[in-house]
Structures are given as structure tokens and as C-alpha cells.
Amino acid sequence: MTAIKLDGNLYRGEIFADLEQRVAALKEKGIVPGLATVLVGDDPASHSYVKMKHRDCEQIGVNSIRKDLPADVTQEELFAVIDELNNDDSCTGYIVQLPLPKHLDENAVLERIDPAKDADGLHPVNLGKLVLNEPAPLPCTPNGSISLLRRFGVELDGAKVVVIGRGVTVGRPIGLMLTRRSENSTVTLCHTGTKDLAAETRAADVIIAAAGQPHMLTADMVKPGAAVLDVGVSRKDGKLLGDVHPDVWEVAGAVSPNPGGVGPLTRAFLVHNVVERAEKLAGL
């Protein structure tokens, strides 16, 4: 058996086609949504991600604002840029590209963002609203992951879902999202303290691998026919690798490639959050 490809690039194109129409409708009312990025330092991967985000904006007609700062920027200088974006009406939403250099307090930076302009959905207030199931910008990677499963008909209602990884950007929030009534999944969150990971994954209908450990999920750990999302990214010998070993494709029923799976949707839902806020401000 060869797994169905959960094609994030295909679905991204569909989302962007919808967003282009929505942005055009906003422009007819004289409103142009704006996405800003704050990038600190010279990390090549971060620069690549930010470049792609601005290219996405250009494609669908969203204004983009770049704030590139040196690696030795102080906490106060970074706060000043964040305060500027908080007060800039042309900026509908923005992100601070993570990770930040070690001398900066990441949590304090995220807290400084205006929760209403939090395009990443990672502000403590918005994560708290997710716990309470109140409307707020949703974290982009979990939202993209769940939407990708839905797009290709993977059943979530009543499904046993195993999430590998307990990070703030994916593992923790995706568990909250999957246990909402709209998804209704039973979720097991696995991590370095899990005693028998293979036993957990072999019982799963859906596996979301977000550990950042290259090829750590192998075919013998997957139930035949299960759906697998390869979310984690790591670098080995200069190559980017996902968490899912290639042999999983011979056992699983559906697998997201990496790259080309969840990644394009993370970017799509970032722009989606900005467009959605612009519509809300416009009363649409």
C-alpha cells in the first residue's frame, strides 16, 4: 500500500484563491490588509521563511511591512519596534519570527504584541482564549494541520490522535484544538517522558509528528491505514528532514510530505488571520 499524499501546496492554492477574492472585496471598500514581520539576526532559515511570507502577501494583494533588526538588538529596542507596530493602523497583524537570539526574552516579546494583531496566534491571551474556546486568532501550524486533514477527508470525530511533541507552537495548542466539539478527537500528547511511544502510535488513527527529530517515526510504529502528519523539521548534514521516515508511506493510509505538507498551510493561515481581522474591522 502506498499512502495518499496530503498535499499542502495543492490546498494552499485553494486557500489563496479564496483569500484573493476576499482581499479584492476589502479593497473595494478602501481597505488594504497589512502583514508585518519582525526579524532579528541573520539566521538563513528565518530569512527564507520571512521572504516566503512576503511573497505570499504580494500574491494575494496584502501589503507587507518588514522590520529587520541586527542580532545584537536590545530588548528595549525590540520593544520599541513592537510598540510601533501595535500603533500602526496600516499593520493589521504581525509576527515576530522565532526563535530569537538567546539574550532576548521570547515570552516577554510575545506578551508585548497587541493580542488583536497577533497573526501567529501565540500571544498568552489568545492561547488562553483557545483553552476557553473563545474566538481569537488560532495558531497557524495547528490550524493548518487540522485543515489539511479535513481537506483530504481524514475522519477526526471520535478518532484517536497521537501528537508527538509538546512545544508551544504545535504540540500543546493542537491538542486543545482537536478536543473541541468541532473536531471531537481523543488526544494523547507524547513527549520525551513517554515510556512506550511505539505502543501509543500503533494504536492511533492519526499521528501528528512534531518533535523535530529526523525520521523518528518509522513504519513499525504506525497502524496500517493511519493518517500521518509530518510537522517537525530538523537539519542533518546540511539537509532539512522531517520527523517521518520514508518507509511510513508503505504502511500509512495518508501522509503529508515534508516539505510540501503542513508548511505551506502555516503560511496560508498566517495571511488568513490577517485578512480575517481586516474583515472584522470593516464589519464584514
From Swiss-Prot:
Catalytic reaction equation(s): (6R)-5,10-methylene-5,6,7,8-tetrahydrofolate + NADP(+) = (6R)-5,10-methenyltetrahydrofolate + NADPH; (6R)-5,10-methenyltetrahydrofolate + H2O = (6R)-10-formyltetrahydrofolate + H(+)
Pfam entry (one): THF_DHG_CYH_C
Gene name, Swiss-Prot/TrEMBL: folD
Record-listed E.C. numbers: 1.5.1.5, 3.5.4.9
Subunit description: Homodimer.
Residues given in the record as NADP(+) binding sites: G165, R166, G167, T192, V233
Alphabetized SUPFAM superfamilies for the sequence: Aminoacid dehydrogenase-like, N-terminal domain (SSF53223), NAD(P)-binding Rossmann-fold domains (SSF51735)
A GO cellular component annotation in the UniProt record: cytosol
Protein name according to UniProt: Bifunctional protein FolD
Keyword line: Amino-acid biosynthesis, Histidine biosynthesis, Hydrolase, Methionine biosynthesis, Multifunctional enzyme, NADP, One-carbon metabolism, Oxidoreductase, Purine biosynthesis
Main function: Catalyzes the oxidation of 5,10-methylenetetrahydrofolate to 5,10-methenyltetrahydrofolate and then the hydrolysis of 5,10-methenyltetrahydrofolate to 10-formyltetrahydrofolate.
Gene Ontology biological process: L-histidine biosynthetic process; methionine biosynthetic process; purine nucleotide biosynthetic process; tetrahydrofolate interconversion
Top-level taxonomy: Bacteria, Bacillati, Actinomycetota, Actinomycetes, Mycobacteriales
Protein's organism: Corynebacterium glutamicum (strain ATCC 13032 / DSM 20300 / JCM 1318 / BCRC 11384 / CCUG 27702 / LMG 3730 / NBRC 12168 / NCIMB 10025 / NRRL B-2784 / 534)
Pathway entry: One-carbon metabolism; tetrahydrofolate interconversion
InterPro entries documented for this protein: Aminoacid_DH-like_N_sf, NAD(P)-bd_dom_sf, THF_DH/CycHdrlase, THF_DH/CycHdrlase_cat_dom, THF_DH/CycHdrlase_NAD-bd_dom
Highest taxon in the source lineage: Bacteria
